[in-house]
Design a protein with these regions (language model features):
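Acidic-glycine-rich active-site phosphate/pyrophosphate-binding loop
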Residues: 1-4, 54-61, 112-138
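Short beta-alpha connecting loops at secondary-structure transitions
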Residues: 6-14, 100, 129-147
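Conserved ATP-utilizing enzyme core subdomain
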Residues: 34-67, 81
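Active-site nucleophile and cofactor-binding loops and adjacent substrate-binding regions
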Residues: 11-19, 79-81, 103-109, 143-154
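Adenine-nucleotide phosphate-binding core of ATP-dependent small-molecule kinases
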Residues: 61-90
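Glycine-rich phosphate-binding loop plus the immediately following alpha-helix
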Residues: 6-47, 160-164
Length: 195
């Protein structure tokens, strides 16, 4: 039913590693960029190239091709940031419009300046396109924040959720039960789901 109230919808990438730090790590290692340099790499004003963001393997393939064409590492990484952010905006919003204020969470957003800059460049475009009302006198980029400890928010949420669970949930029940689950239980669960 329509209530006229807005609903907060926390969301995490659940589709593919293409929108995660794992892809950044893998491509960064291939390009041999020191971590300290990666953290300071920019996005603003850097030439972008088409990179698939839907799949980490596709992104890596595109980056490999661009690298062979002589595209410099700063342009490769900025293009990867763009691909990841655009994919995440598609997957995470699931057709909804992000409301101000947006929190950027997770390690890549915490540590990599170019990722933060990319979000701050792309989210305001969506707000403008969709006519989202923003607080007066506040630059749109200031409504996109990376809180202290952003890299730990998912873990903190898991802990908070776990505090509400029964004390027996998540306790190690011995090798026998683990072995049973790996050899039998997992297959039984798949069969129940029709898999």
């Amino acid at each position: 039913p329509e209530t006229g109230r807005k609903k907060k919808m926390p969301s995490m990438n659940d589709k593919c590693a293409g929108g995660t730090g794992a892809v950044i790590d893998k491509i960064n290692a291939k390009l041999r960029i020191p971590s300290e340099q990666l953290c300071e790499m920019g996005y603003k004003g850097v030439k972008l190239h088409p990179v698939a963001g839907k799949c980490g393997v596709f992104a890596e393939t595109d980056i490999n091709g661009l690298q062979k064409m002589g595209v410099p590492p700063d342009e490769l990484m900025a293009s990867l940031f763009e691909a990841i952010v655009m994919q995440n905006l598609s997957v995470l919003t699931r057709g909804n419009t992000l409301l101000p204020v947006v929190l950027l969470l997770g390690g890549p957003n915490c540590y990599i300046k170019g990722m933060r800059d990319c979000w701050k460049a792309n989210i305001p475009k969506i707000w403008e396109e969709r006519g989202t009302l923003l607080p007066e006198g506040v630059p749109p980029e200031d409504l996109i924040k990376t809180p202290d400890n952003a890299q730990y928010f998912a873990a903190i949420g898991s802990v908070e959720f776990g505090k509400s669970e029964d004390d027996t949930v998540g306790q190690y029940a011995g090798w026998g039960k683990l072995e049973w689950y790996v050899t039998v239980g997992r297959e039984e669960e798949k069969a129940k789901r029709g898999g």
